[in-house]
Amino acid sequence: MNSYLEYTSCGDVVAFSPKFCRSDQRNMTLQPYPGSGADHPFMPVGGVPGSVAHQASHQSPALYAPCSLDVAYEPPPPSDYSFLHSSTDYDYYGSNHLVEETGGHIPYGSSVFPGNGSYILNGQLSYRTLGEETQMAQIAQCKEPLEVYPGGNLQSISPSPGTYPKPASPASDTHVSTFDWMKVKRNPPKKSLQSEYGVASPPCTVRTNFTTKQLTELEKEFHFNKYLTRARRIEIANSLQLNDTQVKIWFQNRRMKQKKREREGSLPNSPPSGPASSICVKTPLSKSVHETATLSPSKDV
């Protein structure tokens, strides 16, 4: 089989390569055109031997009009395109043009030449803009290798937990020293109880449950001193593991209890202590003694 397909058009022989057309190409139709062949010169497309061209010039004088070939051809497979902007690193003159500095390459292709050409660039990166999938672009830009699962899905490019150590917080490293003036005891806010009618009841005061030992020591101290100074109150509170306010309130309640018992008569009046004990109390017995003392000198006179 010949390597070229010959077609006669306007006195010239047109040759096509069999790669240009598929096997199911259709026949073309030629229409005659009046005039001389010199008015419409045509250059041969493919290389034709000189003898064949000479024989064609001496054929019948019938002339044909310029025609178009109705030829079905197979489009090239899709390829990658690279739209490169003007820069000093590369130049877009042709498919095999080399740049001054050599380096990485960029794959490209076109509808005419679907081959694997490359531009020589300064660098090691591959640029794919058109006709490339998103996953392939991520793989080209990612520096770290990606793990591929059996299903074909790509794992996220985010680093796995624990890859980079978390910086320690300064609060955990430095120990904040607590001063004495910062140790201020503040009572928590007291919550009011809801009554059955929905009205908030007054807050209840939490009572202190004293132990037997604490009550014994407090009663002993109250027997000797009904009023305490602040220094003595702090000393008793430290010895009994109480605070100053608890001791102060206990002594106030104890004095009120003592006065209540005296008013009710359940307890005799305690003799006052101190200088008040030297005051004389007038009784009927002392009055009779005084009268006898006053009468005795008169008898002597």
Swiss-Prot record:
Gene3D superfamilies (alphabetical): Homeodomain-like (1.10.10.60)
Cross-referenced PROSITE patterns: HOMEOBOX_1, HOMEOBOX_2
Biased composition (Polar residues): 291-301
Cystines in this chain: none
SMART domains assigned: HOX
Keywords linked to the UniProt accession: Developmental protein, DNA-binding, Homeobox, Nucleus, Transcription, Transcription regulation
Chain residue ranges for the region called Disordered: 255-301
A GO CC term attached to the entry: nucleus
Localisation: Nucleus
Any GO molecular function: DNA-binding transcription factor activity, RNA polymerase II-specific
Motif, Antp-type hexapeptide: chain positions: 178-183
DNA-binding region(s) in UniProt: 200-259
Role description: Sequence-specific transcription factor which is part of a developmental regulatory system that provides cells with specific positional identities on the anterior-posterior axis. Acts on the anterior body structures. Acts downstream of meis3 to pattern the hindbrain.
Membership in a protein family: Belongs to the Antp homeobox family. Labial subfamily.
Protein's recorded name: Homeobox protein Hox-D1
Lineage: Eukaryota, Metazoa, Chordata, Craniata, Vertebrata
Gene this chain is encoded by: hoxd1
